[in-house]
């Protein structure tokens, strides 16, 4: 298995730390006036999602994590697992609630949304939905003419249950595009 020395550390690198796959978020090289140089590294545990800080002496090395990102289509949810299929090999994978985290509120069944799934030893660690999704509004207050003093918007419930702030002119039953990274309304879809 490959290993990375401290001079190869950079954000996004996936390494093994204490038997857990981690992604490096930040790496700072510190050379004090006296003593040995070291790296102050901020890592995210890919299994638990926790962020931890660790220091490594210059010259230390970490084993590379056998983590693979793959794009798969979302199929359906059976109540316990979310099922995904590889678009070319038709291989299917199921992810549990911990791997899904917040992605559940952006995925609609039979939408064939292309999600990025992080796999470790063949098991899904995390699921990232597409950057933009198009969902129908199931519930929102009607926009009242002249009610623009606040300038903001109004909450709207989407067909997946997610709640997004939309402009006052958007009505119930319309389809909107939402940015899944921020949860913000982007535009109406005709």
Curated annotation (Swiss-Prot):
- Please give the name of this protein: Elongation factor P
CDD domains the UniProt entry points to: S1_EF-P_repeat_1, S1_EF-P_repeat_2
Can you summarize the PTM annotation of this record? May be beta-lysylated on the epsilon-amino group of Lys-34 by the combined action of EpmA and EpmB, and then hydroxylated on the C5 position of the same residue by EpmC (if this protein is present). Lysylation is critical for the stimulatory effect of EF-P on peptide-bond formation. The lysylation moiety may extend toward the peptidyltransferase center and stabilize the terminal 3-CCA end of the tRNA. Hydroxylation of the C5 position on Lys-34 may allow additional potential stabilizing hydrogen-bond interactions with the P-tRNA.
Q: In which pathway does it act?
A: Protein biosynthesis; polypeptide chain elongation
Q: Which domain of life is it from?
A: Bacteria
User: Which coarse location class applies to the principal site listed for this UniProt protein?
Assistant: cytoplasm
Q: Modified residue N6-(3,6-diaminohexanoyl)-5-hydroxylysine is at which positions?
A: 34
Protein purpose = Involved in peptide bond synthesis. Alleviates ribosome stalling that occurs when 3 or more consecutive Pro residues or the sequence PPG is present in a protein, possibly by augmenting the peptidyl transferase activity of the ribosome. Modification of Lys-34 is required for alleviation.
What is the organism of origin for this protein?
Psychrobacter arcticus (strain DSM 17307 / VKM B-2377 / 273-4)
GO molecular function, one example?
Answer: translation elongation factor activity
Task: Give any Pfam family that matches.
Answer: EFP_N
Give an example GO cellular component term for this record: cytoplasm
